Amino acid sequence: MQDVERLINEPVGCPGALNTFWHGELGDAWTAPRFVPYHDGEVPDDACGRQVNDPRQFADNALYCTLDDTVAYSVDFLDELAQVGGPTYPLFVLMHELSHRGDRIGGNLGVVTRAEENQADCFAGRQASAAHDAGRIAVRDALQGALLFYSLGDTRGGWFAQEPASAPDAHGSPRQRAQAFALGYLRDSSTCHTIGRSETGDVSF
């Protein structure tokens, strides 16, 4: 778990670090992110928490807050993920949220909500690939990301089929999320941008 924390916090130039990856994508436009941990039953101490002020909206969650450029996460949620899949599971969730930050800094937003979420899953795969190439995480752990995002895909009693790709909370289906992560891991950033341009939120090549 300590190496996972180092991957998140190490400065630009450290092999496999997430800041190194994003600096390679965005140059000096990328700055070290600010993380805001909180517990279920609380609201994060950031602009999104102050605006909503309803702990239920933040339970078992992690999010990038565009209002003040922060990444907030429930410590309880990430601890639960670590118990299920080991320390890389929470790492992949934070990679996903950092992808939203990178997309906004780079001006590469998805055309609809579901496409934007799938694009973030894809860039989580890109970051996992960079960390593996630097010898920071094992290939087995990296590919576990596809299983994680499959488990986090939208099912919710047919919700995926009932809501349009532009719905505010739309994410990819289990298959789409796993496929997006795997494509990011195996291919390149242009693949992720292609996913972000899908008006239906589909992930197919």
Regions found by a protein language model. Name each.
Residues 1-50, 187, 191-197:
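A metal-dependent hydrolase signature that marks the N-terminal structural subdomain at the beginning
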Residues 12-15, 25-26, 121-158:
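Short helix/loop segments within enzyme catalytic domains
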Residues 89-97, 101:
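Short alpha-helical catalytic segment bearing the HExxH-like zincin motif
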Residues 98-114, 126-133:
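Catalytic Zn2+-binding segment of zinc metalloproteases
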Residues 159-205:
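Pan-zinc metallopeptidase signature
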Residues 40-72:
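Catalytic zinc-binding patch centered on the HExxH motif and its immediate surroundings
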Residues 71-74, 101, 122:
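Structural recognition of the beta-strand scaffold that forms the well-ordered cores
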Residues 75-92, 109-114:
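Short pre-active-site segment immediately N-terminal to the catalytic Zn-binding motif
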